[in-house]
Amino acid sequence: MAVLTGKVAVITGGSAGIGFATARAFRDEGAQVFITGRRKDALDAAVAELGSGVTGVVCDVSVPAELDAFYQAVREQAGGIDVLVANAGIGTAAPLGEVTEEVIDSVFATNVKGTIFTFQQALPHLNAGASVILTGSTAATRPDPGLEVYAASKAAVRSLARGWALSSRARGFRVNVVSPGGTRTPGLLELIPAEVLKQAEEGVPLGRLAEPKEIAAVTTFLASDASSYVNGAEFFADGGYAQV
């Protein structure tokens, strides 16, 4: 039987990349899925490709009022939330000496502030036993030059999960982190030259970057009842990159 049958799942940043692959995996496992994105055209295209069982809502996760409206729409259409994936995030490269206030503010607004409000505003709508999954990054453990601000934001996400896990008994949820390594998302493939991608692959013990569906598979496990006793943990889906 599909492992998410009857569950209502929310995925922020679901119009492309890992979020899109996660939405597809959840749909295939029987969940009713709601995804967010900031660009209506990309969101509409994602929903059209994913088909029935997936609903898209334009939402900026750094704006609590937009999240409130989104969660109210989910409740009206599907009821309470069983799985919440706080996946929306951005990464901006800025070498030391060239970091600006704008870089810090934009990265932390989405990756930290957005993650906090994605979870906090969802609290009244979570069903008992809900699984909350935050998207981290190997950058928090093994940062690359120029991505220190991004790495710091993802380290904050890991810390948030530890703190929130302490509230899980009283509030009836569990919270975990999935930290991908380099992943062959459309955005990465468009931005990174082929020779740089090859160098990145050589630094991974498995010798390749991840496919988005491989990250989605880990998230699906954490969303399912098979992980019912997993709480406050970080799952690295990185081919061993940050482990050796």
Model-derived segments and spans:
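Short, small/polar-rich loop/turn modules that mediate ligand/substrate recognition or access, typified
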Residues: R169, R174, V230-G232
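Conserved glycine-rich cofactor-binding loop
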Residues: V8, S15-G17
